[in-house]
């Protein structure tokens, strides 16, 4: 018997926030696919504890647990039968990540998988390119603790994760050798080919909203200019002048620094943003692996 599931959800425990994405399962011509139904972002910054102390404090752990319990309660009310949970850079950095994930499972029945950097980068393989040509596109996910990059051309995939993220840089826990590693890896990609740097996640969307809200693309010079502006403003000015969320106001310039570093290798490129998220990849992967899931 097929397991009928009208909705699936994914909880993504990041370094700067918890992201919850809920999907409606649809079928068309014998193909089952997921459509984003609703999403929620909860500001719980694990990265400060993770990158400064290599351990999640009891206070931060409590905030995390309470937030996920509330999400689970809401999911249960909507009869969401299957929930996938992933954790990324902050959780794989700390000494008590496994213990916390087991505690979450015990309290909510949600299994949380701590992704390796490589696993996180490989999920970008599920990115929906839409109008972007694959051979001209670099998919980049800059989070609070790490940056994942994916390139696909002529049947060849290049995927890599680097421990360079906006919160990590804010806390001055980025290492010069990781910047060197990023530069060396980027030389594997034909620089003249890349026209589109597609940023997935909230940092890229915020950057393009500020620079070019209607066209949704930004040049490297525009990014450099915005970075300089942000560096010359205090926290309150960033929030009020740019309407930045408080939990991004202190890190956006650091996300821009990573984008600039990448774009310097690709002189013909512009930064685009996408609403796609690695949670979409997790759900798509689950649908491919479990053929018993279908639309209700």
Language model features: what each stretch is:
Residues 11, 42-44, 140, 149, ...:
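Preference for bulky hydrophobic residues occupying beta-strand positions
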Residues 2-34:
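N-terminal basic/disordered segments at the start of proteins
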Residues 31-45, 69, 75-76, 84:
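Conserved ATP-binding subdomain of kinase catalytic cores across diverse folds
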Residues 2-4, 132-133, 142:
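Short solvent-exposed loop/turn micro-motifs enriched in small/polar/acidic residues
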Residues 11-17, 140-147, 200-203, 277:
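A short acidic Gly-Thr/Ser loop motif
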Residues 8, 22, 49-80, 88-136, ...:
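Helical "lid/coupling" subdomains associated with nucleotide-phosphate turnover
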């Amino acid at each position: 018997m097929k397991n009928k599931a009208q909705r699936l959800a994914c909880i993504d425990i990041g370094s700067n926030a918890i992201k919850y994405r809920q999907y409606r399962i649809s079928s068309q011509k014998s193909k089952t696919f997921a459509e984003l139904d609703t999403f929620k972002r909860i500001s719980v910054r694990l990265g400060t504890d993770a990158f400064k102390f290599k351990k999640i404090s009891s206070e931060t752990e409590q905030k995390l647990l309470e937030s996920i319990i509330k999400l689970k309660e809401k999911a249960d009310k909507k009869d969401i039968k299957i929930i996938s949970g992933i954790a990324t850079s902050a959780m794989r950095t700390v000494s008590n990540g496994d213990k916390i994930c087991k505690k979450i499972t015990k309290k909510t029945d949600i299994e949380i998988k701590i992704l390796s950097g490589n696993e996180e980068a490989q999920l970008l393989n599920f990115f929906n390119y839409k109008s972007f040509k694959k051979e001209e596109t670099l998919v980049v996910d800059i989070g609070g603790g790490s940056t994942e990059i994916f390139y696909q051309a002529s049947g060849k995939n290049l995927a890599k994760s680097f421990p360079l993220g906006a919160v990590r840089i804010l806390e001055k826990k980025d290492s010069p050798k990781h910047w060197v590693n990023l530069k060396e890896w980027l030389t594997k990609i034909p620089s003249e080919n890349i026209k589109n740097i597609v940023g997935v996640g909230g940092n890229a969307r915020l950057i393009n909203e500020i620079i070019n809200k209607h066209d949704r693309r930004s040049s490297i010079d525009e990014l450099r200019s915005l970075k300089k502006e942000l560096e010359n403003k205090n926290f309150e000015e960033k929030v009020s002048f740019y309407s930045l969320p408080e939990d991004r106001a202190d890190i956006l310039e650091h996300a821009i620094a990573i984008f600039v570093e990448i774009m310097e290798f690709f002189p013909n490129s512009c930064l685009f943003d996408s609403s796609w998220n690695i949670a979409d990849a997790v759900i798509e992967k689950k649908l491919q692996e479990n053929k018993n899931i279908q639309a209700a």
